[in-house]
């Protein structure tokens, strides 16, 4: 087993990693910025090292400082958590080159899955369903383009190869508009990105966001741990997550889950990972793979009984996964609300001192947070201050428990988005289950 781990992160995930290390008897090193001296995990770690000033670029993204911290403390591994350097292939490479274990996949796999084109190619090869498309840029041959569009099926979306941020995209609903739309998107792409290459993809009108949790070890084993539904989003940021996803049968779960597990073996994956899909009309379409632990991992832990962070540590130590696929049984239902220090109406961050905190409790209630009474939420980082997770035998029980838990929570001194969560949980369509990724923004009157 690993002997000493550097926790290269902050906030609730750093505390989550510390708890798993302690349970496994692993010593911990907390690296922190000058703004984070009073973080809960910093107060609890075996050793602490300040790695720089408050801005992330000078601390949590400071690769030489993090590796130096591992060297001076005699650590044998570094856990990147999520965000920051967790999906930075250069960091993973430098960690391993410096003689430490990176708790995550290899740098090559992070690179492969971090590039959209190579990731989709690898997934198609491994039998994971992807969004049907033109398999590369379209030509000027309109007859051929019409043929491709017909094969994909309308509506389609034309995207600029060099595009991003919502620019250089056009939805086409019929063949009549195809030629003109391609020409217009090409012209836009040339003007905006100096690259007029465009490609076609099937346009999904009202998809849900469904993702599959996987674990893979260095002994050729890979397992899937059911799915999560993260469709309740605002500005592409997940707000509420749940597991399992409403309406997904065991048969469907087994099919898509085993494809993801097989893909892990194909690409030589190791550690915890998540395959993200758009799900519409009973079909899954791969969008990307997250090569790290995710914010919403607790809902999977609640329904499977697996400690995902402990498995990450075991795998990094060279041990096989501690269970087999057939041992995994989905039981009950779990929900997670991301509690942010922000104004519930304007969504602007609300840093400051937490004068008083009362966290909820009771059967099936889990509170993952680094915040305590007297703690000051700094303005430099992500606004998430807690994750409230509830579990019940049924989805209805999990929702009711979440409503109770939210009403019990007292966070005095700063504003939080708890009113937004209360609004979502009492929404009739959310209670039925299966709302799509646009639902919350439409409800908030945000659809642009």
Curated annotation (Swiss-Prot):
Q: Where is the Biotin carboxylation domain?
A: 1-445
| Gene Ontology MF annotations | acetyl-CoA carboxylase activity; ATP binding; biotin carboxylase activity; metal ion binding
UniProt entry keywords in alphabetical sequence: ATP-binding, Biotin, Fatty acid biosynthesis, Fatty acid metabolism, Ligase, Lipid biosynthesis, Lipid metabolism, Magnesium, Manganese, Metal-binding, Nucleotide-binding
* ATP-grasp domain segment(s): 120-317
User: Which pathway does this chain act in?
Assistant: Lipid metabolism; malonyl-CoA biosynthesis; malonyl-CoA from acetyl-CoA: step 1/1
The residues that the entry says bind Mn(2+) 2 are: 288, 290
Q: Which domain of life is it from?
A: Bacteria
Q: Which residues bind Mg(2+) 2?
A: 288, 290
Indicate which residues the UniProt annotation says bind ATP.
Answer: 116, 159, 165-166, 201-204, 209, 236, 276, 288
Cofactor(s), names only, from the UniProt record: Mg(2+); Mn(2+)
Q: Which residues form the active site?
A: 292
Describe its partners and assembly state.
Acetyl-CoA carboxylase is a heterohexamer of biotin carboxyl carrier protein, biotin carboxylase and the two subunits of carboxyl transferase in a 2:2 complex.
Q: What is this protein called?
A: Biotin carboxylase
| Protein's organism | Haemophilus influenzae (strain ATCC 51907 / DSM 11121 / KW20 / Rd)
Q: Which gene encodes it?
A: accC
